[in-house]
Amino acid sequence: MGVCISHEYSKPTAQETEIQQQFSNFSKVDERPPMAVEHQMYDYRQAYEEQDDELFAIICCPHSIGFDRDKIALIDLDPTSDTYCTIISEIRLTSNGDEPGRMNWAKSAESLIEMDKLIRKNIIVPCMNSGKIYVIGFDKNKFYMEKSKNIFKLQEIRSDELFRKDVSCPYAVRSLPLKGAPVHVSTMGDRYGHGKGDFVLIDRKTWEIRKKSDPTFSSFGGDFSLQPRHNLLISSEWGHPRLFRDGFQPSELENVSESFGSCLHVWQISPPKLLQSIGLDSFDGSLVISVKFLHNTDCNHAFAISAIGSSIFHLHMNTLSREWQADRVAHVPSLKVENWVSDEMPALLTDMIISMDDRWLYVCGFLHGIVWRFDIQDPFRVSLHGKINLGGVFDSSPEVRIKTSNAMEDRWWLPPETRSLPRGTKFRGGPALMQLSKDGSRLYVCNSFYKAWDGQFYPELISDGGQMVRVDIVDNEMRLNKKFLVDMKDQPNGPFVIRDIKFLDGDCTSDSFL
């Protein structure tokens, strides 16, 4: 996909010039190669030994049917608490059908050891369907709508403010650990719902949108990741919002579709500038849904996954030419099936998590119902290390069968397993989004990604609501915790689904280290 030019831009302000100077100072500190094969990783056990385990989590809960408002909720994760696995605080968004995307804190820690010291007061919630961006305050385990200068006005960035800048469908949020730096929010469409990859910059003092000093945008937008030490941003491509909001067509699951992007874009953060666009294979890279840098700031390596292409890519830079390239290091093959919407079923990779020590990569297959664990200590030679079954189409719809006789011998595949969860329930849908504890011992998994996709493949998610489960990493094996379950089926005014998970003191996805 190509890159286009916008018409609305302005010269850098004095504050933006100061931020650019901060970046230039950091870029001169260290000119070492980006990474050795045996790279130095965070000793998370030493940094984390005096910290409590995560006791609370903020989760995003869209209303599954849409006749009531979505909400953001605080969940008790303390096993010794009387309110374990229940909502102890919540706040409703202001309108129906917002459909929140990937929320995040407005502040980022500079390093792992600074995470527990950082005071996080505001969480940014972008909404894919309504186009709004909410600023929600959080203090003493309570939510409140952040006020603007007019104390009577609830703080939300309305969709018409984005339309005036010809952007829509805000999706992901990242923050820089620099004083005065804005919050970055990726957008995936123009005002008409056509594909357009751009960014909205939000001032952390006024919560107003800053003017862009660079007019460039990409054909499609999606997820993105920041590497402040190297002044880099990498963004991915989804597709046209007006099309993916209606779910998938059967042909799009088997063939290359122009509805979805297959590129990764490397940007300079400040001053903003597109450095390179990386075209992936049109099918293997179809719908690049997530991209993440390693946590180690000395390493500017990253990983990306594609949903329909069901592939994992390793991104790295040639130190001589300074050119980036993306190598496909793993591919989950589609399964030939019958009695389903298509003759082939991709894994539909929807999320990935890199452990804080940069040793492990977790990837979830929404349709196959499997979470895979990869060893990425050598990012050029990624190896599959473990897997666990959590629902999936074959568990949800027994009439769907696999045609290939050797599927059970496939190293990627696990036969569907109906697991008995607390309160006599089973895991509905498939693994969609994840969060990992900082010590890498607990993987939290929820089963909603986007309601149009949820309802298409798993109608029971819409009728019965979402869930969150916990997978414990014990002796390098993934084991489902039978005592943990958050179930939204019987919530008042529900049902709700569960999407996105954030810990109060930061997690493996919240911060962009410097």
UniProtKB/Swiss-Prot annotation:
PANTHER family: METHANETHIOL OXIDASE, SELENIUM-BINDING PROTEIN-RELATED. GO terms for molecular function: selenium binding. SUPFAM superfamilies: 3-carboxy-cis,cis-mucoante lactonizing enzyme. Keywords: Selenium. This is Putative selenium-binding protein. It comes from Caenorhabditis briggsae. InterPro entries: Se-bd. The keyword rRNA-binding does not apply. It comes from the Eukaryota. The keyword Iron does not apply. The lineage of its organism: Eukaryota, Metazoa, Ecdysozoa, Nematoda, Chromadorea. Pfam families: SBP56. Belongs to the selenium-binding protein family. Signal peptide: none annotated.
